[in-house]
């Protein structure tokens, strides 16, 4: 192949495979030479312009006869040249200003682009501060002349686009891609300046004269310059023509943006002069149309810009969509939910909910779905900030009650939350439960003086009952703290939102257990999704027993015992609490999440398998009657025995999975200890406790006689008081109380949880917490105010739970959530 001569265009040099290195060296030399020549040509042109300006200034400053005589002969053409020089100088000044602005604008633009990338949004209005920034690709061109808005070399030429290049001289694909990354709106000031300049061009003919008139002079000055540097430049795309010579040309072509967009592969150093781009574009058209009209040139350039506007519109549209979608609003709803229906999701995925709700009770941003599972208070000791809960209202029927609750619980957040571990470490369960009793008693509007006597400790905040209900997210029963309003509360309970109602009822029972509310009867059975609605509350008061070793874990087997303490004197309450603290410490040794006695493992599995999803028996029309009859049942239940009796919900025996169990040696020793404790305490408490006979709440419910082990069981439950984090783990609680010695041996709590997946893992057995009031015998409502109910939640393993159920107490309400 023939050696490539140096004057050949650089593109051909790169196409020679044999002499690639040599060609590159020659190309570098060629580029350097051309760059120097272009610089020389630019300097020569500038020198020519300087001479013209000097002549103009001299003619202005030295008026005289000589100047006047010379004026008619030779100054008339010079005066035109001087005008042109003035115009060119003004253009140069404008261009320098543009360059200064552009230097500052690029830096600020980079910072803003970084911010935009970080924020995933494009701010198209900040660049109005820097007038000479590159145009955004977001704005379509208003007309052909405003095509400069899409210049990648933008700010250098935007104001004073002289005849050297039109407003869209840089519209090519590469330039378009640069514009897309720009993300900046074109300054209106630059555009207005450019319009003013264009008008001045058309008025004075500056463009044509600047190209044609100084041509001869520039040729004289730059006679030694290569002629190609004196030619107009046509860009690669053929749409842009850069006319020569213009004082603006020498400055504008040095823009790196211009070089990148027009020359692509050429370095930024080449276009030192308007002549440099001629080399780079390889489209040198010698002496191309110097006399072509500026209007026609602008028209051509505007045509170049129009095809790109649609693409820029699309890009702007896409970016605007990105901007809109950048920051979606986060809602209070959880990112993931096990089920669309919060009630069913919690019921059927209790094990999942257990792990989610470990720390829910102390967080202020808890969803209702989690708040339902919040650890209900160990004797009401854990309080949750009420302010978060009224906002969480997935249950439409609880909204009103939540509002009432929020009004009635202004200071719940101030109440310190205490867990059972704190009670253990401090051995302070006595004082804490007393304070709980007092706080709950204060929460009730219609408490009697007897209850006030019980609730003596002044240091307990009065809003504790509300705190317990706030965990349940505004239970409808907390909304009406007054025991006289109990009928309304019962009416609030329809099983529309099952999980939430269950929790609300649970919170209600927690609060009302200290608030002299009557023990409520419930329907015997409930379906899997509704079992939470239909639980059976057992009225109970806790009696201390001897110590038992059970270690309490917050995240593990949670057993809830809702106790409804009857009228007790202060000393008795203190005594109960003292024994409770002892038993609490001992119980802290036993329970692990999977901790089960060997004899109970099979039973737990059978409970899961055998307990069917019981059909729900809902009689909403019975609710008014039940409301009217609750007081009677309460009074009668209080008067019959030394402690209140249970209206226990019994499942048919054929449905019982663990109807009878053989007692282990541990259980037998348990019974003996409980007997001794009960005998000791019963003598002390006998005169204090009122006796209330209970009517049957349902075909399966019957009056609970005073069991031999009721006192021991109560103390056992009291000693294991713990806030439970799972209300919804199980719908039914299998009654394991029944043994030959217990009068309630035949009793069985409402079935096992329908969450069969949960019962294996957590062995959750639960008393259903919802009041579906069956007709109850009418009794006086006076006892509603005198019955102080206490919720005692027990967190226990399967074996402990079964033992507790075996020693079924007549005054206990057991809610096992393990």
UniProtKB/Swiss-Prot annotation:
Entry keyword set: Coiled coil, Cytoplasm, Developmental protein, Neurogenesis, Nucleus, Wnt signaling pathway
InterPro entries: Dapper
Function: Involved in regulation of intracellular signaling pathways during development. Specifically thought to play a role in canonical and/or non-canonical Wnt signaling pathways through interaction with DSH (Dishevelled) family proteins. Binds to dvl2/dsh and impedes the degradation of beta-catenin (ctnnb1-A and possibly ctnnb1-B), thereby enhancing the transcriptional activation of target genes of the Wnt signaling pathway.
Cellular compartments annotated: Cytoplasm; Nucleus
Composition bias, Pro residues: 1-10
GO CC entries: cytoplasm; nucleus
Region Disordered, annotated ranges: 1-30, 60-80, 122-144, 455-486, 510-530
Gene this protein is translated from: dact1-a
Quaternary organization: Interacts with dbf4 and tcf7l1-A. Interacts with dvl2/dsh via the C-terminus.
Domain notes: The C-terminal PDZ-binding motif may mediate interaction with the PDZ domains of DSH (Dishevelled) family proteins.
PANTHER family linked: DAPPER HOMOLOG 1, DAPPER-RELATED
Pfam families per record: Dapper (PF15268)
GO biological process, one term: regulation of gastrulation
UniProt motif PDZ-binding: location: 815-818
Biased composition range(s): Basic and acidic residues: 21-30, 122-132, 512-524
Expression by tissue: Expressed in the animal and dorsal marginal regions at late blastula and early gastrula stages. Expressed predominantly in the anterior neural plate at neurulation. Expressed mainly in the ectodermal placodes, including the eye anlagen and the otic vesicle, at later stages of development.
Lineage: Eukaryota, Metazoa, Chordata, Craniata, Vertebrata
Region called Interaction with tcf7l1-A, residue ranges: 1-337
Coiled-coil blocks: 79-130
Protein name: Dapper 1-A
Ranges of compositional bias, category Polar residues: 455-485
Origin: domain of life: Eukaryota
Family: Belongs to the dapper family.
